[in-house]
Amino acid sequence: MQTAYWVMVMMMVWITAPLSEGGKLNNVIRGLVPDDVTPKRISQSLISRRRFDSRIMFVPSCIWKTCPSYLHGDNYDLKEKDK
């Protein structure tokens, strides 16, 4: 717990120190983020991950062992199937 406190204090000092030298908060925050991290790059990364995930087949979710009615015409109870 004590270590977490000091890490938090040091982070606050690291962020606010440039402000005491006349820097603007917006510039300080931008300095903490790498230049190649942009909204466009983040969205491209997410889209490329979705393409790889498309290989995974769709598995319908069943809540409390009852599947949605659109899968089987009426409620399909997994407990009855196991008997």
From Swiss-Prot:
The modification D-tryptophan is found at residue 64. GO terms for molecular function: toxin activity. Residues 23-55, 71-83 form a propeptide. Residues 1-22 form the signal peptide. Keywords: D-amino acid, Disulfide bond, G-protein coupled receptor impairing toxin, Hydroxylation, Secreted, Signal, Toxin. Belongs to the conotoxin C superfamily. Consomatin family. The cysteine framework is C-C. Disulfide bonds join 62-67. It comes from Conus raulsilvai. The modification 4-hydroxyproline is found at residue 68. The keyword Signal applies. It is found in: Secreted. One of its GO terms (cellular component) is extracellular region. This peptide is an evolutionarily optimized stable analog of somatostatin. In addition, it adopts nearly identical conformations as in the somatostatin drug analog Octreotide. As this drug, it contains a D-Trp at the same position, whose synthesis is a common strategy used for enhancing the metabolic stability of compounds in drug design. Consomatins evolved by gene duplication of a 'Somatostatin and related peptides (SSRP)' gene expressed in the snail neuroendocrine system. Expressed by the venom duct. Moderately activates human somatostatin receptors (SSTR) with a preferential activation of SSTR1 and SSTR4. In vivo, does not cause behavioral changes in mice within a few minutes of intracranial injection, but causes a progressive loss of movement thereafter. Four to five hours after injection, mice recover, even with the highest dose tested. Shows antinociception and antihyperalgesia activities in two mouse models of acute pain, most probably by acting outside the central nervous system. It comes from the Eukaryota. This is Consomatin Rs1.
